[in-house]
Curated annotation (Swiss-Prot):
Disulfide bonds: none annotated. Belongs to the bacterial ribosomal protein bS16 family. The keyword RNA-binding does not apply. InterPro entries: Ribosomal_bS16, Ribosomal_bS16_CS, Ribosomal_bS16_dom_sf. GO terms for biological process: translation. SUPFAM superfamilies: Ribosomal protein S16. This is Small ribosomal subunit protein bS16. Keywords: Ribonucleoprotein, Ribosomal protein. One of its GO terms (cellular component) is small ribosomal subunit. One of its GO terms (molecular function) is structural constituent of ribosome.
Length: 107
């Protein structure tokens, strides 16, 4: 069973609120999850400390057991200065370094 750390959307229409959850990668985005490890409210200002809340000890636990975070969750984890496993760090850095904008084709 592959486990992911990802966002699950909740809240009303045009008023999004996301739970940061540990879920099986086959389950739907808003479907069943194993554990809730935080929340993200994009409606709050960026400097508000309640915008992103994480349970750092539980995230470290799941990362040590092989959970794969999504790109957005990796950004949140880095804000909280949680150390990512070396394999995830390499994968994330490779994606950023190999990104090259393709030149437009002129005819």
């Amino acid at each position: 069973m592959a486990v992911k750390i990802r966002l699950a959307r909740s809240g009303a229409k045009k008023c999004a609120y996301f739970k940061i959850v540990i879920a099986n990668n086959c389950s739907p985005r808003d479907g069943a999850f194993i554990e809730k490890v935080g929340h993200y409210n994009p409606m709050l200002p960026k400097d508000n400390h309640e915008r992103v809340v994480l349970k750092t000890d539980r995230i470290e636990h799941w990362l040590s057991h092989g959970a794969q975070p999504t790109e957005k969750v990796i950004n949140f984890i880095q804000q909280f200065s949680i150390t990512l496993p070396l394999a995830i760090q390499k994968k994330h850095n490779i994606k950023l370094k190999n990104y090259v904008a393709k030149p437009s084709k002129k005819k």
